[in-house]
């Protein structure tokens, strides 16, 4: 049997795509004159929407009180758990007794920027010893690393 592709059997997404209705091309096209906007009024004009406008009702952002602030020099910490390091070792991406620092974590794709500070937390279990160079570590994480013979050095 002939398995050749016939031109009349080819269907593309382009042939199935319905073209949008053109607006404002005269009253004969069905969407002419007002182009589906109705007559007059604020929504009939160009540049229509006013963000946060609720029809004269006091808007939600003026009803709610102002709260808090954003500190200018906020420290951005990338959180690394000891369980994450264990999983990396099990996946053979790192070897035991190695140094875990910013450059290593950046190359592995664990942190987005080399400028981020690293915070070591104690989620999960660690079974091999590692040397950590981090900016912050919780007390529980320090104990967990020390219990398997590793060490944590705080950089800043």
Curated annotation (Swiss-Prot):
One GO term (biological process): translation
Region (Disordered): 25-48
InterPro entries for this protein: Ribosomal_uL15 (IPR030878), Ribosomal_uL15/eL18 (IPR021131), Ribosomal_uL15/eL18_sf (IPR036227), Ribosomal_uL15_bac-type (IPR005749)
GO molecular function: rRNA binding; structural constituent of ribosome
Alphabetized Pfam families for the sequence: Ribosomal_L27A
Annotated S-S bridges: none
Alphabetically ordered keywords of this record: Ribonucleoprotein, Ribosomal protein, RNA-binding, rRNA-binding
Residues forming coiled coils: none
Comp. bias (Basic residues): 34-43
Keyword Iron-sulfur: no
Keyword GTP-binding: no
One GO cellular component term noted in the UniProt record for this chain: cytosolic large ribosomal subunit
Its biological purpose: Binds to the 23S rRNA.
Family indicated by similarity: Belongs to the universal ribosomal protein uL15 family.
Assembly and oligomerization: Part of the 50S ribosomal subunit.
PANTHER family: 50S RIBOSOMAL PROTEIN L15, LARGE RIBOSOMAL SUBUNIT PROTEIN UL15M
Protein name according to UniProt: Large ribosomal subunit protein uL15
The encoding gene: rplO
């Amino acid at each position: 049997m002939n398995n050749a592709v016939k031109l009349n059997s080819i269907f593309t997404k382009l042939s199935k795509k319905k073209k949008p209705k053109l607006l404002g091309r005269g009253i004969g096209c069905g969407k002419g004159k007002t182009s589906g906007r109705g007559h007059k009024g604020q929504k009939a004009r160009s540049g229509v929407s006013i963000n946060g406008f609720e029809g004269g009702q006091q808007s939600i952002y003026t009803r709610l009180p102002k709260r808090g602030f954003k500190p200018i020099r906020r420290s951005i910490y990338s959180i690394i758990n000891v369980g994450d390091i264990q999983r990396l070792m099990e996946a053979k991406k790192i070897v035991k007794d190695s140094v875990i620092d910013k450059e290593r974590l950046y190359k592995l794709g664990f942190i987005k920027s080399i400028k981020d500070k690293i915070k070591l937390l104690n989620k999960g279990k660690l079974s091999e010893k590692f040397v950590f160079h981090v900016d912050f570590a919780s007390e529980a994480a320090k104990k967990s690393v020390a219990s398997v013979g590793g060490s944590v050095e705080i950089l800043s």
